[in-house]
């Protein structure tokens, strides 16, 4: 199994990226939270920490910003009822620090708000998260700081970030507007984008 891939970020879309390394293009599934951070790194060298899921007909790569995030994903998919898609949805909804806080507070409702997770699954997840997550992921100020940069126009910056992930301008405008309508006027881009992505996923699951 690969520990990481270092190469040129050549392509991004919602939930996926392509890294070119030694003439090969690796298609990797990754959390949208991280892809938004990478939107300014297109055609530059990046490091992706990978996890491989072996299926009957293919090997699927999942990518993360750090070994810690990858270990969290590995732990999540080891739980009953949680596959790679749901594991990514959890990491896409919550930062590592937030997930740790949720586990410590035993906030089942927060876990149940993740697309693809029902109340019963959330209750089962909480038992394991409460036991394992605080040891694996001590609170890290860097994880929070990476999402705290505030830019002049959250609306414009949010639309640009979603456009970099492949969303059309009308879709991006709608997603950002819906998210901002649920948040305080002084909400930061870091608060707006996860809500926009979450609401969009919920809408797709209902359709």
UniProtKB/Swiss-Prot annotation:
Chief place of localization: cytoplasm
Domain I: annotated segments: 1-65
Listed GO MF terms: ATP binding; four-way junction DNA binding; four-way junction helicase activity
Compartmental location: Cytoplasm
Biological processes per GO annotation: DNA recombination; DNA repair
InterPro entries, A to Z: DNA_helicase_Holl-junc_RuvA_I, Hlx-hairpin-Hlx_DNA-bd_motif, NA-bd_OB-fold, RuvA, RuvA_2-like, RuvA_C, RuvA_C_sf
Domain II, as annotated region: 66-144
Region (Domain III): 155-207
Region annotation (Flexible linker) ranges: 145-155
GO CC term (a single one): cytoplasm
Keyword Cell membrane in annotation: no
UniProt keyword terms in alphabetical order: Cytoplasm, DNA damage, DNA recombination, DNA repair, DNA-binding
Pfam families reported in the protein's UniProt record: HHH_5 (PF14520), RuvA_N (PF01330)
Chain segments annotated as transmembrane: none
Assembly description: Homotetramer. Forms an RuvA(8)-RuvB(12)-Holliday junction (HJ) complex. HJ DNA is sandwiched between 2 RuvA tetramers; dsDNA enters through RuvA and exits via RuvB. An RuvB hexamer assembles on each DNA strand where it exits the tetramer. Each RuvB hexamer is contacted by two RuvA subunits (via domain III) on 2 adjacent RuvB subunits; this complex drives branch migration. In the full resolvosome a probable DNA-RuvA(4)-RuvB(12)-RuvC(2) complex forms which resolves the HJ.
Family: Belongs to the RuvA family.
Record note on domains: Has three domains with a flexible linker between the domains II and III and assumes an 'L' shape. Domain III is highly mobile and contacts RuvB.
Function: The RuvA-RuvB-RuvC complex processes Holliday junction (HJ) DNA during genetic recombination and DNA repair, while the RuvA-RuvB complex plays an important role in the rescue of blocked DNA replication forks via replication fork reversal (RFR). RuvA specifically binds to HJ cruciform DNA, conferring on it an open structure. The RuvB hexamer acts as an ATP-dependent pump, pulling dsDNA into and through the RuvAB complex. HJ branch migration allows RuvC to scan DNA until it finds its consensus sequence, where it cleaves and resolves the cruciform DNA.
The protein's name in its UniProt record: Holliday junction branch migration complex subunit RuvA
Taxonomic source organism: Chlamydia caviae (strain ATCC VR-813 / DSM 19441 / 03DC25 / GPIC)
Lineage: Bacteria, Pseudomonadati, Chlamydiota, Chlamydiia, Chlamydiales
